[in-house]
Amino acid sequence: YCKKIHPELIELANQRDDVRVIFLQHPILNETSFAISKMVIAANYQNKGFELHNAIFSSQGALTSEKLEQAIKDSGLNEAKLRIDMSRDETEKILHLSSFLAGGVGARGTPSIFINEYFSGGYLSKEQIINLLK
């Protein structure tokens, strides 16, 4: 559902000044989601975290290694630096902090959406989100 809601959130944020979208890396599925989360965090050292996140979540179908390599290229990342930054202690600490924060506010699954005082632990349509913003 994260891939399904991603373009809707980006569209809302681009259309409305009163909407702010914040992505926390909160891997819960498997080692692959953990590695991809580390990769997105490491991309921030090159100021390309959002670009990589967007490229990954904009890809169609299952994320293959080929699609991931293409997302890295499309994001304009230096891949060698990205691999080094993924192994930094800081990257690991940021990932653990992000998961800690997500868990601390009740996010047990993904996507988790907070709209003012409302919390949804799952997918919401764009229309549902707009109704909650009123």
Range-by-range predicted roles:
Residues 3-73:
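Structural alpha/beta surface segment adjacent to cysteine/selenocysteine redox centers
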Residues 1-13, 70-134:
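C-terminal cap of thioredoxin/glutaredoxin-like
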